[in-house]
Structure formats: C-alpha cells, structure tokens
Amino acid sequence: DYIIVQDSTLIKDVNVFFGMKEGGIAIVNTEKAIDSPVPKGVKVITIDATSIALQKIGLPITNTALMGAFAAASGEIAFTALEDAVKRRFRGDLATKNIAAAKAAFDAVKGAA
C-alpha cells in the first residue's frame, strides 16, 4: 500500500492512513513530523515538497517532487522512467525544472533511507 498526502492539514480531519497494511508507505508533504497515529508497520516519509517545488520550479506545484519521493521510497518507478514521463508531458525549461524538483525529492528520500 502507498499513499501520497499533498496537503498535510488533511491529517487532522481525515484518517488518511485508514486501511493501510503493514509494510505500507505514506509520503506526506510537510516539513514537520507527523503526530497522528499511524497503523503498525506503516512507514511514514515526510518531505517538504512545497519548498522543493518553489525552489526548483518557482511555483508551489508539488506533483513532480512527490513523484520523485515516491520513486525513491517505493522502488516501483525507476527515476529514469519518471524523467522520461516528465519529458513527454513538458517541454523546454518547464521539463528541466520539473525534473530538477523530482530529482531533489528523490535524492532527499534516498539520502534519508
């Protein structure tokens, strides 16, 4: 099981971890530690994807940063596959910036492992 939480304020109002099984991974866009109960055996990875997006893209659009974090945490997607997908979706400078955001998040998660 995997979940990606783009807005960490949801955790206060919604049990985003409901139904997650042991061995699951939750990636949460936040600069803070999670203080909500987490099911046994679920690994929570926090990453400040908003700051990464602002720094690399210039906008608080977190999608590619969170996908980079997901690729690193899960191993389900090779970074090269993510990079290729970004290049198919975006062109020029926008592709370069989104790849940089994904790579920064990927490296941050790999470095924390």
Predicted regions and their residues:
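Active-site cofactor/cluster-binding pocket
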Residues: D1-A113
